Amino acid sequence: MKHLIRTDDFTTQEIESILADAELFSDGRFDRILRDKIIITLFFENSTRTRSSFEIAAKRLGAEIVHLDVANSSTKKGETLVDTAMNLDAMGPHAIIVRHQNSGVAKILSNHTKASIINAGDGAHAHPTQALLDLFTLKKHFKNLEGKKIAIVGDIKNSRVANSNIELLSRFKMEVILVAPPQFLPQSDLRTTHYLEDIIDEVDAIMSLRTQTERHSSQTYASLKDYASDFCITSEVVGDRDIIILHPGPVHRNIDICDALLADKRCKVLEQVANGVAIRMAVLKKLIYDV
């Protein structure tokens, strides 16, 4: 059984196939090909977009969704996460979608299940379906990504979204530039800067990231407003440039992106959300139906 833990679990050819399926699904062309299939969602961290879009994706393809209420599960009685997964797997689901605050959990569980494990985010490690929907959004806008430049701005060091996008967008020949204060920059061979203004005239897209305060061991800024004074994506910074704006959500208004830009047609945040359903439909098809 194939799992999706990281974007590099799929070949480039497989990703192209997923994008093609997502294009059909986004146009409303799909059948209930997962009828009689069962998918379990196992979320140990809060989620609005990812969980909802996976559930909508599964239902549109005809699958049954079972959501395990983690707060009332046997993990609260001392059952290990691996034992929980093995017991759920014994019930015969076709996929288990997992989000967990610790990096590596999805990979560990994939070693103990017959069902496909789909990583819906593990700590600061990876969020593969987010990167796939971001790629889909960018390709719909630009068609050919080769040579295009994207600035990823914000708390990159603590972002699973950044990790997955760096791998995937680089594979599709985009130049990724990292923009962040020193404490938010990971060690990387990529081009980096502390000032968005330095590269604003070069980039074709900006991906803003939320400050991951829940993953900080100590306070890094006196306040989020102090952070925003340097790294909020504002109308003044972007001006009238032909740049599209992305964000994986949730957006901190006027911290990550200003209100005016969120209402601007160049902002693709809601398009990303819509594309997330189509991409997750395509991923479910790939892992459950196309085997």
From Swiss-Prot:
Carbamoyl phosphate binds at R49, T50, R99, H127, Q130, G249, P250. Its EC number is 2.1.3.2. Pathway: Pyrimidine metabolism; UMP biosynthesis via de novo pathway; (S)-dihydroorotate from bicarbonate: step 2/3. It is an enzyme of class 2 (transferase). Keywords: Pyrimidine biosynthesis, Transferase. L-aspartate binds at K77, R160, R210. InterPro entries: Asp/Orn_carbamoyltranf_P-bd, Asp/Orn_carbamoylTrfase, Asp/Orn_carbamoylTrfase_sf, Asp_carbamoyltransf, Asp_carbamoyltransf_Asp/Orn-bd. Catalyzes the condensation of carbamoyl phosphate and aspartate to form carbamoyl aspartate and inorganic phosphate, the committed step in the de novo pyrimidine nucleotide biosynthesis pathway. Heterododecamer (2C3:3R2) of six catalytic PyrB chains organized as two trimers (C3), and six regulatory PyrI chains organized as three dimers (R2). This is Aspartate carbamoyltransferase catalytic subunit.
